[in-house]
Amino acid sequence: MKLSIIVKKIGMLIALVFVMGAIGQSVLAQNLDTQNLVRFSGGIGDISTGSTNTTVRGVAAAGQIWVIRDLAADVSQNGSIRLDGRGLLLGAGDAVGSNGNASVFATLFCANDGNVQHSSNPAGVALDVNGDFRIDDTLSPAPPNPCTSPVLLIRVTGAGSWFAAGIPKN
């Protein structure tokens, strides 16, 4: 009889631990979600036309066509950025399908602060041969909270022109 009571109590304790764990994960997920300032899912490559209509928030487009297969980025309220890009490659010309030996950095613009450039380290990260890259950095200066009408540009080091843009995620 005592053994069955002990087994029941252990079962209840295990169930309680699982419930508390689930609640804890839910709270943690909500806290992480509220720390995000802006998120981006998907990317648009630069299709230069030779006119100024490809200038975005004062930044000129690259001189050649660039394509990007995928982009995902999270910018936190403290300005930290985690960005994964896939397949950022030249989309035309003699070097089509190559990474152009480029290095890139990210810049976030917010309409409510006059489109100040909030950038990752301008020394950038080199594109892998297949155009993949990761930026794990802190934007400087830190963006405002909230950040209205956010625009995220992937830019080439040196010249600073843009190769790709992130698509804001709601």
Give the residues covered by each predicted segment.
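N-terminal segment immediately downstream of the Sec signal-peptide cleavage site
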Residues: 28-72, 169-170
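A mature extracytoplasmic/lumenal domain signature
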Residues: 87-89, 110-112, 139
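Bacterial N-terminal signal peptides
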Residues: 11-22
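Exposed beta-strand and adjacent loop surfaces of beta-rich binding modules
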Residues: 80, 101-105, 149
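Helix-rich interaction surfaces within compact, conserved domain-sized segments
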Residues: 114-170
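Extended low-complexity, serine/threonine- and proline-enriched intrinsically disordered segments
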Residues: 95-114
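Short, surface-exposed binding/anchoring microloops in extracellular/periplasmic proteins
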Residues: 56-100
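N-terminal secretory signal peptides that target proteins for export/translocation
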Residues: 1-8
